[in-house]
UniProtKB/Swiss-Prot annotation:
UniProt-listed Enzyme Commission number(s): 3.6.1.23
Designated name of the protein: Deoxyuridine 5'-triphosphate nucleotidohydrolase
GO biological process: dUMP biosynthetic process; dUTP catabolic process
Recorded GO MF terms: dUTP diphosphatase activity; magnesium ion binding
Catalytic class of the enzyme: hydrolase
CDD domains: trimeric_dUTPase
Reactions it catalyzes: dUTP + H2O = dUMP + diphosphate + H(+)
Keywords: Hydrolase, Magnesium, Metal-binding, Nucleotide metabolism
Its biological purpose: This enzyme is involved in nucleotide metabolism: it produces dUMP, the immediate precursor of thymidine nucleotides and it decreases the intracellular concentration of dUTP so that uracil cannot be incorporated into DNA.
Pfam families the UniProt entry points to: dUTPase (PF00692)
Amino acid sequence: MKVQVKLLDPRLGKEWPLPSYATAGSAGLDLRACLDEAIEIEPGQTVLVKTGMAIYIHDVNFAGLILPRSGLGHKHGIVLGNLVGLIDSDYQGELMVSVWNRGQTTFRLEPGERLAQYVLVPVVQAEFEQVEEFEETLRGAGGFGHTGKQ
């Protein structure tokens, strides 16, 4: 599938690699911090970081997700401030990453550092049918923890 990409930072593709799939089985493309200088993110602090690119999906059957990189989250407590970024198919602006330091120490984010990943996913838009009652199921309305440990 092809999507349109605008490079908004001239360092992408020159100083820093363009996003690409690391392996044939990779689901995500790494997004980089397009910063002019390193920033220090204090514990509990959230900052908005530019990626230097805009992606226009165009196809209403797809959306983009911005997800945290597992190593940054596990090793440094660096995750997304909004947990998951949802990019609609008709959005054409720059991809931004809300970076949250949930760790205990200050984290230094360097220019060009990989900070999140972008995944393209299929979308199904639901058509709601209003009903008075649902068809009965074994689970019913059982919610959080309903099935217990198994």
